[in-house]
Each structure stands twice: as C-alpha cells, then as structure tokens.
Regions:
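Short, solvent-exposed secondary-structure boundary/capping segments
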Residues: 119-126, 173-182
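A conserved glycine-rich beta-strand in the N-terminal activation segment of trypsin-fold
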Residues: 19-23, 45-48, 52-82, 107-108, ...
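Catalytic nucleophile loop of clan PA
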Residues: 72, 186-207
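Sec/Tat signal peptide C-region and signal peptidase I cleavage site
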Residues: 12-17
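Flexible, gly/ser-rich surface segments that form the specificity/activation loops bordering the active-site cleft
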Residues: 20-23, 88-89, 133-179, 187-191, ...
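Bacterial N-terminal signal peptides
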Residues: 1-10
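Catalytic-histidine neighborhood of serine endopeptidases
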Residues: 65-68, 74-119, 129, 144
Length: 219
C-alpha cells in the first residue's frame, strides 16, 4: 500500500471470516500501545459548584492519564501512530503524549523521525523503549476482500481486536496522490493510529479515521 511505502517500511485474496491464531495475540499485544497524556496535578480553573465527576465512567475518573489514541512498534525502536493523535496533544494543558503498555508502564517519546500531515502518520522513537522491543511483521502487498483486524484502544478502554474485510482502495480526495484503504472492521474513538492486520497478523496499514455514515473506515 502507498501508506506503508510512505512510512519508509519494507503497503489479501477472498477469504471467509477467520480468527487470528491465539499464539499471535501476545506478540500483537506487546507491540500495541495506548497513546496517553498525564492529567494535570491540579485544575487551574475554578467552578461555581462542584463538578459531577461521579457521572464519568470509573476508569476515566480514576485514571491518571487521558487515553487519546493507539500506536504500535515496527522494530528497532520505531513506533507509528496517526499524525492527528500527536497533534491533538500539542500545546495542551495535559502532559506530552506518551505510550502506555498493557501493564500500565509509560514510555516518553524520544524523537520524531517522519511526519506527514496529508497522509496522517508519524514515525517516532521512545526515549527508553521497552525491553524486547516487540514489533509487527509487515505485509506490503495486501489483496482486496481478505479478512483484516483493526487493533486499537477503542473508546479508551484498552487494546481490543475487531475483524472485518479490506473492501476497497479510495483515491485521496484532493488530487488522488495516493489511495486510502477502506475496511469494514469496527473503529471507535481511540482506534486512531492503531495497526490494521491481515489474517496472519502482519501489518498492512494504519487505522486513521472512521466513516461518519457507514462502517467503512480508512487506513
């Protein structure tokens, strides 16, 4: 896919729905992270009356971090997320964007290596990557109509995997400079920046945006 080529990485035939091999799941989980920002220690604003914080979900009101997206490892201390996920954290009252693994360990971002506003991706390093530096294998020639899996931090509730089909390629709207991948696996707020995997657990794209009117999403 053009998107994977644009990342500088090494982009499915018709298939019926199939589950990922359970043996792949620990590796996928180890290579997938939440993008988080630390909540401020104190609220700089004052309010006329106490806020009804008890109406927020328990996880949201007790977590010390805001969960804003998903990222994943591609090896050699290189990580990928959607460009708009990191941009959302710029000039924020919250802490800088960081990665959090399934065990709750948080890793500060080191250096931005590549960034594309148009294609909406960023490649970066971590200041101190996790031990083992787990990475997803890459498939650069996916075929249409195969089962795919959207991996992400859906709704900020932790990393989940949802299946669908890689349905079509859609030209970029302004001048068709590249093609977006469209897929039917469910995508929710927080999925942005997560990996789109084929049936073998290999990376074929980056989940970027949800279609407003139908369950055909973009990578």
């Amino acid at each position: 896919m053009l998107l994977l080529a644009g990342l500088g990485l090494a982009g499915m035939s018709a298939a019926r729905a199939a589950s990922l091999d359970p043996a792949m799941l620990p590796k996928i989980q180890a290579a997938t992270f939440e993008v988080v920002q630390a909540k401020p220690a104190g609220d700089p604003l004052s309010y006329e009356r106490p806020l009804p914080l008890e109406q927020l979900p328990y996880q949201e009101r007790t977590d010390k971090y805001y969960s804003i997206g998903t990222a994943f490892a591609i090896g050699h201390n290189r990580y990928v997320t959607a460009g708009h996920v990191l941009l959302a954290g710029a000039d924020s009252l919250w802490g800088p964007p960081e990665l959090r693994d399934a065990a709750g360990r948080v890793y500060p971002i080191g250096k931005i290596e590549k960034f594309s506003l148009g294609k909406d991706f960023v490649v970066f390093t971590l200041a101190q990557p996790p031990a083992g530096d787990a990475a997803l294998a890459i498939e650069t020639s996916p075929a249409l109509n195969q089962v795919v899996y959207a991996v992400g931090n859906a709704l900020g509730t932790g990393v989940v995997i949802r299946d669908g089909l890689y349905t079509s390629d859609t030209p970029e709207q302004e001048n068709g400079a590249w093609k977006w991948m469209r897929f039917s696996a469910a995508a929710s707020p927080g999925n942005s920046g997560g990996p789109l995997l084929d049936k073998d657990g290999k990376l074929i794209g980056v989940v970027l945006m949800k279609s407003a009117n139908e369950n055909l999403n973009y990578a």
